[in-house]
Amino acid sequence: MTHLRGIKPALTADAGALTKAPPAPAHLTPAAKAEWRRVMPQLIERRIITRGDLAGIENYCAAIGAVRQIADQMNTMPVPDLKLGGLQIRFMQTARQLAAEYGLTPTSRARVGGDMPDDDDDNNPLAVR
């Protein structure tokens, strides 16, 4: 297994990037499909996702869907189920790791340069150089 800690390489636009978002896989839960519809336009716009990446995005959306499904189930319980809570935490960790992999977190977006402001910081006395 590859060592995943430390500084990650910068994400760059891919020559084979998708230009149109494919429909959400039919087997995903409604919450997972909603997440697919939320993130795919961002990924397509940044040109960092290829057809080969779709399984990873599908796994990310499935993990988010599972987190929401468990949360809904736990909200109906008078006392939270610790086993369900542990399962939810594992799904959250998986979703967070996959989100970072595809540029869906603030730090990973900065590597892509997708959310960087275009304005010039020359006049900013607090700018780090």
Spans of model-derived segments:
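An amphipathic, hydrophobic-aromatic interaction surface with interspersed Lys/Arg
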Residues: 25-76
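Amphipathic alpha-helical protein-protein interaction segments
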Residues: 60-67, 74-118, 129
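Arg/Lys-rich, low-complexity, intrinsically disordered N-terminal tails that contact nucleic acids
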Residues: 1-37, 108-129
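Glycine-centered secondary-structure boundary/capping sites
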Residues: 6, 47-48, 103
